[in-house]
Amino acid sequence: MRTIENHIEIAPTLQDIKEILVWLKEERDRDILGHGFFNNKNIIMDSFRLGNAIVFKHENKSIGLIVWNESDDILVNIDIFVIHPSYRGKGFGGLFYHDVCNYFVEKGFKAVKLFCEPKTSEKFWVKMGLLKLHDCGYTEHELTYYGVLIDVASTIHINNAEKIELWDVEPYEAMETEPRWTWYIENDEGRLLYPILHPCNCNWNLRWSRNGDVLKEGKIKYFTDEDFELFKSKFLYIEKL
């Protein structure tokens, strides 16, 4: 939502960043243990120089900051998300997040990932629609969350649709278990009308079927002629078959 009162600055000025560092330092100094994002000042400044800092403005005041980095062409990692203490709990965080998501979508990104820091922010991220990252066998903090930014394939049954099934085990174990996730896909000459995007392990079993006939099955990383084509930033991403 961009208005005179509220908007994001995707190319903030150094003065914007300095303004934010002032209240981040004040917040850090009030904390008995000295916790706070001011301790990440070097990260903030480096990200600003790289063009990876976005500021939220309210009535021309810099009251919010996102620091991010690009994992690859589909995923954005949010390193810092913070709102001025005086403006928390008033809806500004949600406005900021949704505006930034729109910006990321415009840049072609498909998903965001972050670590809930502080832990008290977990409730906010759940409210924003993010999901706790499934255990994919990689080292991730238990408070890692992700959010999908685009419309994806249906998990609700569609008559005559092809089906993609994903197990959270390797192929040799999949014979004895049911798939953990199922998507019903529609495609136009091999390109999915809506893609599939989901956290995964590259060794998990993937099956593509039509009317009960298995068209292809195997590990995600070897599912296409080009190894790891469907595995991006520890996500399964299918836009064509």
Per-segment meaning from a language model:
Residues 104-117:
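Conserved GNAT acetyl-CoA-binding A-motif
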Residues 28-58, 65-67, 184-187, 191-204, ...:
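Active-site rim helix/loop that mediates acceptor-substrate recognition in acyltransferases
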Residues 83, 89-102:
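Conserved acetyl-CoA-binding loop-helix of GNAT-fold acetyltransferases
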Residues 15, 19, 62, 73, ...:
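Short alpha-helical
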Residues 117-118, 138-187, 209, 214-241:
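C-terminal "cap" of GNAT-fold acetyltransferases
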Residues 1-39, 157-184:
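Short amphipathic alpha-helix that is part of the acyltransferase structural core
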Residues 55, 61-69, 75-82:
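Conserved beta-strand in the GNAT
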Residues 117-138:
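Conserved active-site alpha-helix within GNAT-family acetyltransferase domains
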